[in-house]
Amino acid sequence: MSDEKKGFWSRLVSGLSKTRDNIVSGIDSIFNGFSSIDDDFYEEIEEILIMGDIGVNATEAIIENLKEKVKENKIKDPAECKELLIHSIKEQMDVGETAYRFENEKSVVLIIGVNGVGKTTSVGKLAGKLKDQGKKVVLAAADTFRAAAGDQLLEWAKRANVEMIGGQEGADPAAVVYDAVAAAKARNADVLLCDTAGRLHNKKNLMEELKKINRILEREYPDAYRETLVVLDATTGQNALAQAREFSEVADITGIILTKMDGTAKGGIAVAIHSELGIPVKYIGVGETIEDLQKFDSNEFVNALFDVKQETKDSTEREE
């Protein structure tokens, strides 16, 4: 495991401590407190998972999966169920093999999210990560309605050493994307990252804006692979799920960036979003630096949640 990965892993483990207290300590008391596996046993686990923001749908699927495995393996001792439960949660969250296809093709990534969730910061961090992978990145500052969004993104562009187009407050976001596409094509960029607005309180305007941007991309950059990521604040729990649902009504969302995972008691929301909406969490953030945004890995996340020690082979397999 690289030093960067080790650092992220330890921050993730400590960052999920409140979520762990919220979920795991209660579950451990059930595993150790019950002498037999019965309906009450499953109901207690279900209650704790729902209280931990894992959500009703995900919890039901996890419990059903657990019941099947208990039956298959003829398990009688409740304490033996913990490993099966961990495995069931991991299965709910697998991002799939093509989740990061945009990294390997000429791509446009639209990033949307409401104010205050860490959207522009996430765009900057993602630019830095892609640049570190040797990709040629262009940023489009198309969130032109938020004061100083362009200035903030410019700081990140400088830090990541990538080019930024736009940034003028009040400009037409679609016009910024048009200019950025021209720049990306002229410079033969690998990835064009577009920081776009997320004014959910005015869904009609947002929908029109995204339609306009998408029309420009279809016309000007038809061969580019398209990705649309929504940035959500993990500390808002079920509110984050509601936002993801609303955004999916106005855009074809392909993934989630979940920020502020350090110090939230609501980390279980990562499971809920994936299960309820079928949208995978692709990145999680646990701090302020570029290294604090990492690809989501269900195995790592659930191990960190339950504080299961990482196996070395498990970690080295995923090193880039």
Please name every model-derived segment.
Residues 1-98, 104-111, 126-128, 132-139, ...:
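Non-catalytic terminal/linker segments enriched in charged/polar, low-complexity residues
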Residues 90-93, 98-320:
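P-loop/Walker A NTP-binding module and the surrounding RecA-like catalytic core of P-loop NTPases
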